[in-house]
Amino acid sequence: MAKIAAIFQLLDKNVTVSSHRLELLSPARDAAIAREAILHGADAVYIGGPGFGARHNASNSLKDIAELVPFAHRYGAKIFVTLNTILHDDELEPAQRLITDLYQTGVDALIVQDMGILELDIPPIELHASTQCDIRTVEKAKFLSDVGFTQIVLARELNLDQIRAIHQATDATIEFFIHGALCVAYSGQCYISHAQTGRSANRGDCSQACRLPYTLKDDQGRVVSYEKHLLSMKDNDQTANLGALIDAGVRSFKIEGRYKDMSYVKNITAHYRQMLDAIIEERGDLARASSGRTEHFFVPSTEKTFHRGSTDYFVNARKGDIGAFDSPKFIGLPVGEVVKVAKDHLDVAVTEPLANGDGLNVLIKREVVGFRANTVEKTGENQYRVWPNEMPADLHKIRPHHPLNRNLDHNWQQALTKTSSERRVAVDIELGGWQEQLILTLTSEEGVSITHTLDGQFDEANNAEKAMNNLKDGLAKLGQTLYYARDVQINLPGALFVPNSLLNQFRREAADKLDAARLASYQRGSRKPVADPAPVYPQTHLSFLANVYNQKAREFYHRYGVQLIDAAYEAHEEKGEVPVMITKHCLRFAFNLCPKQAKGNIKSWKATPMQLVNGDEVLTLKFDCRPCEMHVIGKIKNHILKMPLPGSVVASVSPDELLKTLPKRKG
């Protein structure tokens, strides 16, 4: 019988020492997607907990998160839980309890927006500043770092020089979005959803007003653009800028998408894993932030899962083509053209082969008309006949040679429904001992080492060469574990015969012991102490744009020197016209109406207001040319002012429950 004698230690010689560890941070709607993100190469995953997670329909139970944590930690990967909504006073106590529960599950960090959380009695969990904190300046970044944030998510609108300046001024880890949907407004500075519907983006319930069609009018009422999706951005794609972002100081590379499905997360995670690995391999000063190597069983493509077109936004310079004005939907890639439309089928000429189940579409008068190919039949070279599941009536409106797109590649998607990746941690194996006892040492790539012994009587083998090969091969069989054998050394006094069944059991027990040792040696971060002397907030007056929604947040800002604090927009104290969006995206620039482009004298710049119209909704656009920003001006609707404040106890009571509290009428 095997004796259990596990010893683990960190061996410095086996640990890659680097001050530049790169973290690939993937989104997860649920625990199943989180596991696949890790298997496809994520160094960390961010996921919503049971509440306050800034995504209305992406919450997960404490049980699911508690089961996810050890899975991640076996790969050295981290779990960050989002608690990045602004909180009403009635929610502070439940939030405090939730944070304590999350800490007990072993999660690595909380991503937060509300500064009131820092005033609560919570465990010493590591804190990350959400993108909702609107971190655009060196002063704000340094302040957040100094009050206890270990990692800060910078605004998507920053350029390389701005990122570099923040990195040089603070010791916080710099996190930056590299892929996914773009909010047109600065994150945390969008109130249009609450103004129009009562659904607060700062509380995870955005109504997506930015994806609606608008008509743009100038100050004379003339139409500049009719019924276009003028606030809808293309999707972020920083593939080409990864090296430059590393040089600017980014260490955590974040993929957007806690609403995205599993195929999307698998694909985009795999894409950036391969991109970052190539950079790490090329440069000697970089390392990945977690353990293992990842093998993908498909070819990742950012163009084959949901996207609205690609832009690198403002990382290099302002560009005119950042908007997805024609449609906020995923139209996919061009694959050819429609040649003829019949009653129940269409003939197409294509540049790529089609398959049964493909999703195809055409754009007709700004509307995407899509259909699923039930059956396709090749009729000639690059020619197909397609029978849709259901023939859209609008297809008969198009003329020959109308462009055809594919937004679902059925064969490619099928690969993602199966096992599409494998991730294994390297282990060095050494077998020593003597005829009465075998000693097996396993050392993981992080340097965690265990020894396992097996007592018995192991005689010299008749065929020494065969016995040695059997021992090496048997010890390297780690297929049912998360490990792979990087090196196998046999240091025995001779070629001993060990029955395969005994060797297999010996190896399995050692691998289990290594699992336990690696989990025991895992070190999660903790709350960063406040700097001494205490920092001072860079402003003394905070407007509603600071999103202060509870007394604890007020106490926080007062503690650090703020004197006057206006209530958050959700408090319904801003009843007049205010900026309901502040954006770096500028419609004057997009339509070549920017005064800076036309004139060189700053004193003569004059950008008159414009209007955005959607049905009965009229929004005023004002332009602040010095910082190059557009302000979307609107007013909260009267019926919303009469609603209970979001997050309050009253707001959580349903109408039926409220009726039950009314006194019953007598006879």
Regions inferred by a protein language model and the residue ranges of each:
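Surface-exposed amphipathic alpha-helical tracts and adjacent flexible/coil segments at the periphery
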Residues: 2-39, 44-47, 51-54, 68-69, ...
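Short active-site loop/helix that positions an aromatic residue
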Residues: 118-123
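Aromatic- and glycine-enriched glycan-recognition loops and surfaces
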Residues: 57-66
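Short, polar loop motifs at secondary-structure junctions
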Residues: 113-117
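Residues at the C-termini of beta-strands that transition into short coil/loop
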Residues: 131
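Short, glycine/polar-rich helix-capping loops at beta-to-alpha or helix-loop-helix junctions
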Residues: 136-140
